[in-house]
Amino acid sequence: MSNFPLEETGPCQIKFDDIDLGYTKGGVKFKDEVKKTEITYDQTGETIQDTVTKGRAASVDVPLTNSQLAQIEGLIAGAVVDVDGMVVSSSTGLRGRSVAKKLVLTIMEDGVPSIDPKKTLVLFKADPTSKIDWGFDNSGQRITLVTFVGLPDDASGNVGKMWRIGNPA
């Protein structure tokens, strides 16, 4: 039986498509929720008699700060970095699977990512959605919140799987 250190606290390194996304501010949050339908009968009123699993939703919220354009280009739909900066175009109709890549979170130990493969969480296919809230003042940090939605893998040895704790290979 695996002994993943879920009780540990502290930051993690985040890599999307093998690109280190850099610093975070406010905590990285992983969520996984099983979606169910409740089964009831007219004869038993509102009493739930059974449940049926409809699927699951996995996501990771990553509040990035002090980012370089090259780090966030692939996270902002319609973004392209050129020699003059970054330009963002409308991305209406963009399918998430077309930009989804592997997301790896690795627990930090003594200021560096752990080399223990058991201290990783992997979303095999993660579709990034950015929510930019950049303040321009003298008292706050600019945060680019990116939510990665886990999609079932469709192109590797993990077909149908969404995430794992442990060795990212």
Predicted regions and their residues:
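Phosphate/anion-contacting hairpin/loop surfaces
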Residues: 92-115, 123
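Short, structured patches in soluble enzyme cores that scaffold and shape functional sites
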Residues: 64, 107-109, 150-152
